[in-house]
Amino acid sequence: MPRPGNPKRRVAAAVADVGSSVFSPLADRIAAHPGPIYPLHVGDTWLEPFEGGRMEDLTVAEHPGMHRYCETGGIPPLVDALVEKLRTRNRIPVERDQVLVTAGATGGLACAVSALADPGEEVLILAPFWPLIRGIVRAQRGRPVEVPFFDRVESPEAAVEAVEAHTSERTVALYVSTPSNPTGRVIPQAWLEALAGWARRRDLWILSDEVYEDYVYRGQHVSLATLAPERTVSVFSFSKAYGMAGNRVGYLAGPPDLVAQAHKVGVHTAYHGPTAGQWAALAALRDGGPWLERVRGAYRAAGEDAARVLGQPPPEGSCFLFLDVRPVLQGRNLLEFLEECLEEGVVVAPGSSCGEAYADWVRLCYTSAPPESVAEAVRRLARRLEPPRAGA
């Protein structure tokens, strides 16, 4: 009996278009670099979580079942604490059925996009943006539409004009990140009010990415759900707030019908966020305040120091600076510049990962290594950013 030939193999086009890590082109070079690496490309912290909220602090005796399955929407004490936090700190009037604990904010956004966008429908994304959101929309079979924004818009009216110019009959949602990854900007309330009013007139969803809400140094963070609660899905994370990225715990809040649909998606992908991580998150909400206050000051100082050396405005929030490097490229492509930085051990993220209009920009995170390491990396980067001398 003849054996069948090799079947034709294919992968879904939507997933093939997602792309791999934005750092893939340099991965081998990074691994082979003989000296110290300054990892300014990763949005993370050098700090451990506060004592009492680390995995080593959790015991089975205190938390029976911490290594087992839990409620798919989140352990009840954490959900209760999140309801209280959202009501008091964010001023979002939620009930328990409007809160869903997820496998990180990344998992929460994936669930939300899957719940609100059908295949081929469009999600507007204010650019430059967090690198993963574009791939999340594509992976859920949606179409990301990039709206150059943070370096182009200077008023609430212009903000509305920018999103309106990119809207079509297939548009279903607008993604907004504030405080912004990668720009470090905090969107003013007047701008958010204008965008919320526009979304209401257009009958669109709003995806409000607020994972850096606890790191605001100038201005004031406003949750979009206070302006348009009936159409806003707000997403938060313990990764950034309390240095718990490895725990993979985030949460979303929104209208109960949308949250119910997002919950179904979550059950059939990750099932639920890690149980032990949720107990650590609860400890952070209860006892992590002093740690958060101390870290906020350290982050602010690191950001201001980096901005001063690089000749940039001080960040308003988050833990990033976004730099236009066109003046020093001199006809080269960005990959060559990144390789030159790597010669000094400095790794920064390519701006194209944050939007097609930003291929000649770079993002750096000033909290991904201890302050003395970041300071040295920034000094090395600053040398690479010096304009070429005439005749050189």
Regions found by a protein language model. Name each.
Residues 278, 282, 298-307, 312-326, ...:
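Conserved glycine-rich beta-strand-loop-beta hairpin in the small C-terminal domain of fold type I
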Residues 4-5, 230-300, 385:
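Conserved core segment of the aminotransferase class I/II
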Residues 84, 88, 164, 331-333, ...:
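PLP-dependent enzyme catalytic core of the Aspartate aminotransferase-like
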Residues 33, 140, 201-202, 344:
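Helix C-cap/helix->beta junction micro-motif
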Residues 66-197, 214-215, 219-228, 233, ...:
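Conserved core of the PLP fold type I
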Residues 3-6, 16-104, 111, 284-287, ...:
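N-terminal small-domain helix-loop-helix segment of the aminotransferase-like
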